[in-house]
Amino acid sequence: MGKRDIPSPNENIAPRTIGMRDVDLTAAPAKKAKLDTGERIAVSGRVASVKLTNFMCHANLQIDFKTAQNNCFYIGGPNGSGKSALFAAINLGLGGRGSDNDRGNTVKSYIKDGTTQSKITITLTNAGLNAHPDFDDLISIERTINQASSTYIMKSVKVTSSDNHVERIVSRKKADVDRIVSRFSIHLSNPAFWMSQDRSRSFLANFKPANVYKLYLESTNLENIRLSYIRFADALDECFALIQLKAGEILNEQKKLKRMQEQRDLQAKLDQDRALVASFCWKLLFCKVRDYNDQIELTLKKQEAQKTLQDETKKEYAKNRAARTEVEKKIQEFRDEVEVQDAEIAEAREDLDAKKRKVLEFEEKIRECEQSIRKKTSEKKYMERTIVNAKNEVRILLEKQGNQDLTKRLTKVENDYKDISQQRENMELGGESAKLREKLDTVITDYKRKEEEKYTIQRDINQLRRKIEQDMETMRRSRATKKDAINKFGSHMAEILMEINRSKSRFQTVPKGPLGKYITLIDPKWAFTVEECIGNLANNFLCSSHLDAEILRNIFQSLRIPAQDRPTIIVAKCNGRAYTNLHEPSSDFKSIYRVLKFSDPDVHNVIIDKSNCEQFILIEDKTEAMELMGSNYPPQNAVKAYTLDGSQAYANGPNSQYRFYSGRGGHARGTFGNDQGDVDEGALARLIEDTKSEAMRLETQDLRKQDHELKVIYNERDQTKAAIDEFDRKLSNLRSQELQKERQAKDLRAELAQTANEDQVENLNESIEEMQKKIPLIEDEVKDILKNVADITADMAPVIQERKEAEHTLAEIQKETRDFASKSQKLQNELSKYDDAGEILKIRLDKVKADEGVFFHTEAKLKSERDDAMEMVENDKKNHPMPPGETDPPDLSSFPSTTEAQRKIEEMQKAVDRATVGCDTTITLECVKDFKDKLKRLKYLCRMIEDVLIELKNLHAARVKAYPSLKKFTELKVCNKFQELLAVRGHFIGGLEFDHEKETLNVNVQSSKEKDAMAGRRPEVLEVEEVDEHSYDDDSDDSTGPRRKKSKKSGQKKKRVRDLKGLSGGERSFVTAALVMSLWEVMEQPFRMMDEFDVFMDMMNRKLVMDLLVELATKKFPHNQFIFFTPQGIKELNMVDGLQVFEMNRVRD
């Protein structure tokens, strides 16, 4: 029974309930398909009751659905009875929106006119499948709608055995209502389950394929599923991004934990350092007493040593004085002897000078005689040569007088000339010379080729040997560097610097070196290039004067450094100011100077002067360097460019010519770097041995083979050359003989033409006789001169002997004098030593006497101060408690000196203070432990979340993969169900056709009027005719429906269409109901609602559809609740089990 609080003339007194009655199922059409009878199962979420207060046209309305016995409910009544209001109230009461019910855009528009508040109470069942365990038998949802807002109250209702209802409020939150609705699978916005009046009319009136497809997607929720998959994928990506972000935060937290642990370690170290400082301070209290004891003991030892020293010094001074007296006596004796020797030397020197003058006179006479002898001898030789020449002329003249003999000789000479000429021509034209020379060229070519091969092998050997030397030098430098880093500039560099430091007082200005020590390479990439450029200056020393340079050379010599290992010394003025106006290239280019950093201005100036490195630019690529420096406009002030492998490109300019020298390549030796100590000596030694083996192999095998082959070719070449030389010699002899014979013949012909000259012969004979007479005279003169020389030599001999005796005497006297002088000097030196030693001994005695009193007073003073210090220690002990583990007094045997201890305490205290500044004392062990546990939990949670996300991602991927199958299965299920429902009527042929690309759903159904014509063949696939949104058919028999417009002119050819245009309004409504019921098949909801579904049906279709709906609800879907609203009469409805009917009266006009 319906109930209300305030009666109204225009309001239902009570909805009238019609009971169940028998229905004759045989009245159905003969070809109606039978439906399977399903088992009735209790399902949670059905509507048990609805109560409305001031909702739309209802002031107070309550309807109770007997869900325990029924699952199909018909609510009938004329227009104005509030059926649609009840429909909307169920949707709104469960949390629906006002715009979803086509009765208003806002919720407040549903409040009854004249009132300010509306209330909807929906009671749902909570028994059977999917029941909520936290609620009782029923769930009541009460929504109160005000003008500004709406509120919810959700109650749990327990039904007692006496049918009493006990309520308890569970929640007042909309979110909890939404969760209950979602749990019961109630789709508030699904048009298939909430087929309102306006939605039914619009759907029946505008049955376009696109609209039907849209209804299909909304009803089956496929589109929402696809979009939810996309949103879920985005949400997963965001979650993974958050996990990554959280992982970064965890990493930061780990760093923070590490810093906290470091702080704890620092705190522990601080405690240890403070304990050590306390121990040192405790021992320092006693250090003063210890120092006084040590000083007193030292003073006593000094007193004993002073007394012993005084006695020994007195004895030494007495000995010194006695020895000095003896030396003075010896010196005086030597002085007397020296005076006598000086007089004898003067006398001997005068006698020697006289003897020398006599000898010189005799030697001058002998030289004059020897000059005369040479003159006479030369004159004699000239006469003898003249005689020989004259005799030869006479002989020649006499031979010319016999002409017959000359004719014979001429004939013989001419015959010989012809024979020799013939032999020469045969040798020149025979071709033997060309063959020999061709053979020689071949041998020389082979020889040069072999020499090239030998040169290549020798070059490889030399390169290997240079590499061996470089590697050995690297090893030596590495070993030297390990001893002292400065040795990278030379193996003796540490010794040199040590000796310079010891001898620095000898220098005017201490030399600076090695220069490489003051140079730092900024860019290590250019180490090899910089070494190529200024590496030879790295071990040089800079001296400010030549005197300092000479002292430094003496140091090199004293250290016995080999000449080849001695550093170069550069002498230059040192003013301590670096050059400023340098001729550098543009700043766009890197230069040798710009990659170096100088720590000394004088070294800076020397490197600039010696290398001009500020004008050497650096270019990595060799080709780029050649193009840049070889162009017509090279960089200004750039003299040349260096590359990474040490190649050099000189700039092309008006005063210079472009040149390029390829670098030898290699690795830097570490002169300007810190990598010298990183040499792997074991690997380097193995490399040296391998290189030596390779060099030995080349020398013993390849080189010897080349030498042997060269020797063979060399012998062949020499043999060929010898053959050529022999041939040339023979040919040359023949030519010489030919020329000689030709000249002899010419001379003989000339002699035959001459006549003998007798006067000439006579004159020559006279000249010969005259000169022969002069020769004996010259010989006699020479004999006289020789006799004179013999006499002078005889007279000079005794004088020479006397001179020798005088020289010997003088030498003997001078030797004795030198011996006396040497002995006298030695005595003088000895005397000076005794004087110096005596002076020192005297000073020592005076000092020892003075120290005697000082030591006595010092001892007394130290003892007094020690007593004061002991008293002070006792007072300090009161303010400085003894640290744990120490003794009183402490053991100071291994404790450092007081000054060193104070310095250490000060350093330790400063270190403690510095560490205290950076130490966070608020970090305790408990903090670290808690933070560590928290971080561990956080990491575990992140790991778990990440695992869950991966599992969700896999599930999502599986669902995305299964989505096409779900879509296809849904389509097949809807199509099959639609075919099954059409078969119930038995007058329709067709089905549903999906086009997912065009997003259309064609309902291809044909009336039974064409069934016979189309029997036995499939329906044609016909063209869809485009229909205006407001065009309808004219064959509807429902006068209440809207008027239809004509679709085509009568004269136009009819087309068979695929939509429902060819059906009547009732048939179209039946097909629509069949489609909606097909959609119900694929979606689950505890209850389904349809309002005015039969608006366009004729009586026959309406009854058929109503009975069909009842049968479907009660037999096919007994576990679902169906609520149908209709303005038509329901008296003709067959009453069956599971059906409950309500009739509502008109409440408004």
Swiss-Prot record:
Binding site for ATP: 77-84
Location in the cell: Nucleus; Chromosome
GO cellular component, one term: Smc5-Smc6 complex
GO biological process: chromosome organization; DNA replication; double-strand break repair via homologous recombination; meiotic cell cycle
The organism's place on the tree of life at top rank: Eukaryota
Tissues expressing the protein: Expressed in the germline (at protein level).
Compositionally biased residues, Basic residues: 1042-1058
Molecular function GO labels: ATP binding; damaged DNA binding; single-stranded DNA binding
Disruption phenotype: Reduced fecundity and transgenerational sterility. Increased germ cell apoptosis and hypersensitivity to ultraviolet and ionizing radiation and hydroxyurea-induced replication stress. Increased rad-51 foci in the mitotic and meiotic germline on autosomes, but not on X chromosomes. Chromosome fragmentation defects and unresolved diakinesis chromosomes in meiotic oocytes. Impaired DNA replication in germ cells. Accumulation of brd-1 on chromosomes in mitotic germ cells. In a him-3 mutant background, increased rad-51 foci and chromosome fragmentation.
Start and end residues of each stretch annotated as Flexible hinge: 461-687
Location of the region described as Disordered in the Swiss-Prot/TrEMBL record: 875-900, 1026-1060
Alphabetic keyword roster: ATP-binding, Chromosome, Coiled coil, DNA damage, DNA recombination, DNA repair, DNA replication, Meiosis, Nucleotide-binding, Nucleus
Alphabetical list of InterPro entries matching this protein: P-loop_NTPase (IPR027417), RecF/RecN/SMC_N (IPR003395), SMC_hinge_sf (IPR036277)
Coiled coil: 309-460, 714-920
Main subcellular location of this protein, as a coarse class: nucleus
Start-end of Acidic residues biased regions: 1026-1038
UniProt cross-references to PANTHER family, sorted A to Z: STRUCTURAL MAINTENANCE OF CHROMOSOMES 5,6 SMC5, SMC6 (PTHR19306), STRUCTURAL MAINTENANCE OF CHROMOSOMES PROTEIN 6 (PTHR19306:SF6)
Domain note: The flexible hinge domain, which separates the large intramolecular coiled coil regions, allows the heterotypic interaction with the corresponding domain of smc-5, forming a V-shaped heterodimer.
Function comment: Core component of the smc-5/smc-6 complex. Involved in DNA double-strand break repair by promoting sister-chromatid homologous recombination during meiosis. Also plays a role in the DNA damage repair of ultraviolet (UV) radiation-induced DNA lesions. Promotes efficient DNA replication.
Oligomer status and interactors: Interacts with smc-5.
Protein family (similarity comment): Belongs to the SMC family. SMC6 subfamily.
Record's protein name: Structural maintenance of chromosomes protein 6 homolog smc-6
Provenance organism: Caenorhabditis elegans
Organism phylogeny: Eukaryota, Metazoa, Ecdysozoa, Nematoda, Chromadorea
Chain's gene name: smc-6
